[in-house]
């Protein structure tokens, strides 16, 4: 670290603590904001402060929101009878960007009694007919799906999970065996 530049070093360290930012990139960012474009630096600081102050989880689904209910839960045009369970609010951002789903969400970041009770209340209140699991594929997520299916089997729900298999453009030799196995076992007719 540069001697006598404590504030610069602190900024570099703050950037380097962010995911996917290494020390060289952190130095470039700090230099750009302090020397090359101080207006961008001030704007970034303001935007970070506002995001931290105003973004919170949606009361209903757990998505990122600036209000009690997020835009998705408030949207009258969305399918209100389908609920997609995800692990993180980031997953909602990804699914929304894909424009492949028009229902509601529920962030299941922890599997505990409080979350399960909240999920049950939403299922009943909104008269959900289908529960879609969009979880990272693993033995733990399979166990979670099985547990939730069993817990809510009396609610007359259709349970489904997102398809999995081989990504586009990937050679078979580069696919892990679990994904290849699932792709073969859950193949679709053409």
From Swiss-Prot:
Keyword annotations: DNA damage, DNA recombination, DNA repair, Metal-binding, Zinc, Zinc-finger
Natural source organism: Campylobacter jejuni subsp. doylei (strain ATCC BAA-1458 / RM4099 / 269.97)
Pfam families named in the record: RecR_HhH (PF21176), RecR_ZnF (PF02132), Toprim_4 (PF13662)
Keyword Oxidoreductase: no
Recorded family membership: Belongs to the RecR family.
Keyword DNA damage tagged: yes
Transmembrane annotation, as ranges: none
Zinc finger (C4-type): 58-73
Span of domain Toprim: 81-167
General function of this protein: May play a role in DNA repair. It seems to be involved in an RecBC-independent recombinational process of DNA repair. It may act with RecF and RecO.
Name under which the protein is recorded: Recombination protein RecR
InterPro entries named among the record's database cross-references: DNA_Rcmb_RecR, Rcmb_RecR, Rcmb_RecR_Znf, TOPRIM_dom, TOPRIM_RecR
GO terms for MF: DNA binding; zinc ion binding
One GO biological process term: DNA repair
Top-level division of the source organism's lineage: Bacteria
């Amino acid at each position: 670290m540069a001697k006598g530049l404590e504030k610069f070093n602190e900024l570099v360290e703050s950037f380097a603590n962010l995911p996917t930012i290494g020390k060289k990139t952190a130095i470039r960012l700090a230099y750009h904001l302090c020397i090359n474009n101080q207006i961008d630096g001030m704007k970034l600081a303001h935007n970070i402060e506002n995001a931290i102050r105003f973004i919170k989880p949606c009361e209903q689904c757990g998505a990122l929101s600036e209000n009690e209910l997020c835009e998705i839960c408030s949207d009258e045009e969305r399918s209100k009878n389908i609920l997609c369970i995800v692990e993180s609010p980031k997953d909602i951002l990804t699914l929304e960007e894909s424009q492949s789903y028009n229902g509601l969400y529920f962030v299941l970041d922890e599997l505990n009694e409080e979350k399960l009770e909240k999920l049950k209340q939403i299922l009943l209140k909104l008269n959900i007919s289908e529960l879609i699991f969009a979880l990272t594929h693993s033995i733990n997520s399979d166990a979670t799906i099985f547990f939730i299916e069993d817990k809510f089997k009396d609610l007359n729900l259709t349970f489904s999970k997102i398809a999995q298999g081989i990504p586009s453009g990937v050679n078979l030799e580069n696919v892990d065996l679990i994904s290849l196995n699932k792709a073969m076992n859950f193949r679709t007719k053409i």
